[in-house]
């Protein structure tokens, strides 16, 4: 890794299935895990602008890793000219072709806002689940975001005639309906698969006192069974019906960007009625369910990134999380100290301290 965040140069060889990154806040622990997440999914849960990921005095940042059976993945972030992705030294025409060999699931303190935060946080969480199961999903999301930008720009272009705008919107509606349908179906399918596993974890975490329901509420009216053609036609019609409202507000009123994922405990919205402890248990259960589902469907466990999350959990939940990870998952864990990690965990871990993490700093 070169020029990424506050890391000038960092080279690591993982010799154990567990890497414990220990050090004070601000030393770059989260940045290391973020780099791994970015290489595996092309996304960062902390930042949406690549320029913020590049060290301030360098023109580019580089992340490279050897994974699996010798696959070399490389992602270069440039201030000018965007990104370049390489696999085994070959420049890829599409960055998306980098997704797949490095499946990873992240769990950080930021995820604790999943229950009480805005709907966008739950959409982003579900999108990360779908992406692990179907890497092609990244292309669908890129197309959706591009279409939304184009529609928004179209409403601001006052110089074109109403006839031209109508023709362009008709074309956009067809594309938007197709992409939206495919995203809706994948999100719904993933949540349906995830729900029974999450319910089992919630029962375990609550001592059998709480029931969990996950409801997918699409930002389009979708009646009947999961079927692409009826849903596509329904979304096209809704887009036409909402045009006046869309023009007035300047934003598209129909589509996956308006989805909500409802989390219910005992039949009541956990966001409104769940205690802080219940919400944390729910997030933990969702993450453990995600880990189990991806392992089950992909045939091998993903890399687990635990970013300073243990400090946010009580000792009981800490222990449950560490036990659930077990010996079958490779994981990178950041923390300010080793407390909470049992002797067995430390014995099977490679421990990276502040000196190794930031060799460019003089640490007394």
Curated annotation (Swiss-Prot):
Keyword Nucleotide-binding applies: yes
Swiss-Prot/TrEMBL keywords: ATP-binding, Cytoplasm, DNA damage, DNA repair, DNA replication, DNA-binding, Nucleotide-binding, SOS response
GO process terms (BP): DNA replication; DNA synthesis involved in DNA repair; double-strand break repair; SOS response
Molecular-function GO term, any one: single-stranded DNA binding
Main location: cytoplasm
Any Gene Ontology CC annotation: cytoplasm
Entry's localization field: Cytoplasm
Binding site for ATP: 23-30
NCBIfam families: recf (TIGR00611)
Job of this protein: The RecF protein is involved in DNA metabolism; it is required for DNA replication and normal SOS inducibility. RecF binds preferentially to single-stranded, linear DNA. It also seems to bind ATP.
Family designation: Belongs to the RecF family.
This protein's name: DNA replication and repair protein RecF
Organism: Synechococcus sp. (strain CC9605)
């Amino acid at each position: 890794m070169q020029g990424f965040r506050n890391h000038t140069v960092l080279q690591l060889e993982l010799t154990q299935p567990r890497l414990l990154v220990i050090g004070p806040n601000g030393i770059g622990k989260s940045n290391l895990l973020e780099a791994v997440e970015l290489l595996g999914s092309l996304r960062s849960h902390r930042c949406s602008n690549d320029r913020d990921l590049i060290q301030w005095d360098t023109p580019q940042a580089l992340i490279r890793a050897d994974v699996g059976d010798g696959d070399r993945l490389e992602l270069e972030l440039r201030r000018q000219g965007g990104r370049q992705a390489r696999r085994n030294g070959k420049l890829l025409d599409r960055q998306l072709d980098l997704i797949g060999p490095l499946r990873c699931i992240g769990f950080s303190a930021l995820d604790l806002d999943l229950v009480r935060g805005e709907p966008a946080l739950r959409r982003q969480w579900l999108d990360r689940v779908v992406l692990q199961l179907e890497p092609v999903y990244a292309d669908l999301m890129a197309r959706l975001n591009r279409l939304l930008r184009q529609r928004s720009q179209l409403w601001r272009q006052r110089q074109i005639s109403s006839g031209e705008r109508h023709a362009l919107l008709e074309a956009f509606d067809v594309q938007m309906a197709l992409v939206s349908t495919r995203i809706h179906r994948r999100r719904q399918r993933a949540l349906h698969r995830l729900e029974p596993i999450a319910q089992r974890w919630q029962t375990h975490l609550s001592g059998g006192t709480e029931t969990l329901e996950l409801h997918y509420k699409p930002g389009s009216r979708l009646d009947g069974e999961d079927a692409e053609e009826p849903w596509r036609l329904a979304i096209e019609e809704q887009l036409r019906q909402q045009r006046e409202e869309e023009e007035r507000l300047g934003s598209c009123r129909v589509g996956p960007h308006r989805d909500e994922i409802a989390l219910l405990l005992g039949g009541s919205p956990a966001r409104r009625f769940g205690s802080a402890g219940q919400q944390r248990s729910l997030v933990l259960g969702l993450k453990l369910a995600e880990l189990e589902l991806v392992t089950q469907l992909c045939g091998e466990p993903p890399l687990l990134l635990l970013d300073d999350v243990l400090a946010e959990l009580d000792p009981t939940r800490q222990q449950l999380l560490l036990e659930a990870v077990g010996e079958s998952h490779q994981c990178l864990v950041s923390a300010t100290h080793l407390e909470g990690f049992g002797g067995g965990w430390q014995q099977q871990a490679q421990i990276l301290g502040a000196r190794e993490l930031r060799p460019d700093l003089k640490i007394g």
